[in-house]
């Protein structure tokens, strides 16, 4: 089964990086309803251009609308989905299965994917979404590849193969709301899992590590053969808040692996470490154990270790490890101190300015560092330039020319899927020099800034024909413009049904219903005196004292943040 390589795009630059580096499909979000609210995302004008751009290059365009939807947002949600559908979106990713049901009823032919937050982790959940009319499910990142293969439901399977992991189950994080005041289920993740914590046994700290909830980055490049032979159809890269360099590099790497090119994986992984890594894990997808999922030392970009530093007069001396190179305009980080800098000036072993070093070198001590350290490279200037200058993707087209004296010039263009035929002007008998095949080929091949490149030109013509050069130029322009327009609108197939919302009687009680969370005996008594409807107790001993009261419930504490002050 041919796999789909699905890449992220937080903005137009990232989208182009994905398309030009081999993505089969791209996923992105509008300004509303996406689970990455703090990515740049696309306004309605931009999303239309993004969809057209993807379709022009034969790439599918998916849009995420995967937040949980409030009642007052339902109409806006449906309007946004309709706007996307009318403009040719290939699929919409949704978490809220209430919205799945509404869109399935309103737009029967709109392709819907259940996002990873929809918790597809078993046969039952996959079958549930299949029965709702969902075309594809994105499996939870807690599910192994063997489990995915064992789920025998006629539904497309998608799984994350690279990028950041969420410590909460399938990205459904309540911690962000509770601690950061921003709901991950509403696209506003506060990144609480990347903060430092102390693990306590009573009041005693029992861990030397700070970042107890911070996961490594998923990386399955070593397991590409197993992925190719799996039942997973779409291989998904995380990263809608990452840079165009990250998106382009990761997409190109997986493209090469899927196309079974010969890849020096160690060499490419070193590049990847420079671009972004929190250390790597094969994830639950490939049976990673708990400890190996986590990087509890640091939540940030680690870079690639390239050598060691020491202080020499007013400079920092760097002894580069074998095979490591440092360039002017690279960025480095001193691992133990956690401080970093750009290299504006690089000096060789003789203290002369240079642009590249591969053994001993010196940099200015801009940070006033006073001790030796391990050095990692966190930004590679040459690698960034390499991806900035990447050629745009070209689509192969063929032309067919028929030139008969006394008839219009007839030319067709084909991209292998679409065929357009145009006639223009009139072919005359040559009075002097007849047009030759090479002239026709030369004029039709001048595709300039179009996304096309010529693979073949077939010519049928009478002897001694004359064709105006202007006719060849005009018909080439007309054909390419029509083909661009046809490709851009390749998935516009809108169909809708009326959607009726039946009003139901309010289920809200006229009586106030008050719920309280308490920690102490005095708080419980105060709540009972005030006739609080429901009381949650965190302390098990305290709950045992009042367990016969039907209004009092014991609440398990998943994460112990701090001991509250007793009153």
Model segments located where?
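Beta/alpha (TIM)-barrel catalytic core signal, keyed to glycine-rich beta->alpha loops juxtaposed to Asp/Glu
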Residues: 119
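Short active-site loop/helix that positions an aromatic residue
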Residues: 100-104
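Glycine-rich, highly charged phosphate/nucleotide-binding loops
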Residues: 42-47
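A short acidic, helix-capping loop that chelates divalent metal ions and anchors anionic groups
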Residues: 34-37
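Surface-exposed amphipathic alpha-helical tracts and adjacent flexible/coil segments at the periphery
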Residues: 1-21, 25-32, 48-51, 57-85, ...
């Amino acid at each position: 089964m041919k796999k789909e390589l699905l890449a992220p795009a937080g903005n137009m630059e990232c989208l182009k990086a994905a398309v030009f580096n081999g993505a089969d499909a791209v996923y992105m979000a509008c300004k509303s309803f996406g689970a990455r609210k703090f990515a740049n995302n696309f306004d309605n004008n931009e999303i239309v251009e993004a969809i057209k751009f993807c379709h022009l290059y034969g790439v599918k365009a998916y849009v995420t609308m995967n937040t949980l939807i409030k009642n007052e947002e339902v109409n806006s949600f449906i309007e946004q989905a309709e706007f996307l559908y009318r403009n040719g979106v290939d699929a919409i990713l949704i978490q809220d299965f209430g919205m799945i049901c509404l869109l399935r009823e309103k737009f029967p032919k709109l392709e819907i994917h259940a996002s990873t937050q929809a918790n597809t982790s078993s046969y039952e959940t996959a079958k549930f979404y299949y029965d709702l009319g969902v075309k594809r499910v994105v499996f939870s990142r807690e599910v192994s590849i063997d489990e995915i293969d064992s789920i025998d439901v006629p539904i497309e399977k998608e799984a994350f193969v690279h990028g950041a992991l969420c410590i909460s189950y399938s990205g459904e994080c309540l911690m962000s709301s509770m601690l950061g005041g921003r709901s991950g289920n509403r696209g506003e993740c506060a990144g609480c899992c990347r903060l430092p914590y102390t693990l306590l046994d009573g009041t005693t700290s029992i861990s030397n590590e700070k970042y107890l909830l911070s996961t490594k980055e998923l990386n399955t490049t070593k397991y590409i053969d197993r992925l190719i032979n799996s039942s997973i159809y779409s291989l998904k890269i995380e990263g809608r808040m990452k840079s165009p360099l990250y998106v382009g590099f990761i997409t190109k790497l997986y493209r090469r692996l899927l196309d079974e090119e010969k890849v020096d994986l160690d060499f490419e992984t070193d590049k990847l470490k420079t671009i972004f890594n929190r250390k790597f894990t094969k994830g639950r997808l490939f049976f990673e154990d708990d400890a190996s999922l986590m990087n509890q030392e640091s939540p940030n970009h680690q870079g690639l270790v390239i050598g060691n530093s020491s202080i020499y007069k007013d400079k920092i001396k760097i002894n580069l490890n074998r095979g490591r190179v440092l360039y002017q305009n690279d960025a480095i980080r001193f691992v133990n101190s956690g401080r970093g800098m750009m290299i504006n000036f690089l000096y060789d072993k003789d203290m002369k300015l240079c642009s590249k070093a591969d053994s001993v070198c010196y940099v200015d001590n801009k940070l006033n560092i006073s001790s030796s350290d391990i050095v990692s490279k966190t930004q590679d200037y040459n690698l960034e330039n390499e991806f900035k200058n990447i050629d745009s993707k070209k689509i192969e087209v063929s032309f067919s020319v028929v030139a008969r004296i006394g008839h219009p010039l007839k030319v067709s263009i084909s991209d292998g899927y679409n065929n357009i035929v145009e006639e223009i002007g009139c072919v005359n008998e040559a009075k002097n020099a007849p047009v030759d095949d090479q002239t026709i080929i030369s004029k039709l091949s001048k595709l300039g800034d179009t996304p096309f490149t010529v693979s073949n030109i077939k010519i049928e013509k009478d002897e001694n024909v004359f064709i105006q050069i202007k006719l060849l130029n005009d018909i080439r322009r007309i054909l390419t413009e029509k083909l661009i327009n046809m490709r851009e609108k390749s998935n516009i197939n809108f169909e809708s049904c009326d959607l009726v919302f039946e009003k139901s009687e309010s289920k809200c009680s006229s009586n106030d219903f008050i719920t309280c969370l308490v920690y102490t005996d005095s708080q419980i008594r105060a709540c009972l005196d005030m006739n609080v409807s429901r009381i949650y107790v965190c302390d098990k001993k305290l709950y045992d004292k009042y367990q016969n009261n039907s209004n009092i419930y014991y609440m398990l504490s998943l994460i112990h943040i701090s001991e509250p002050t007793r009153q």
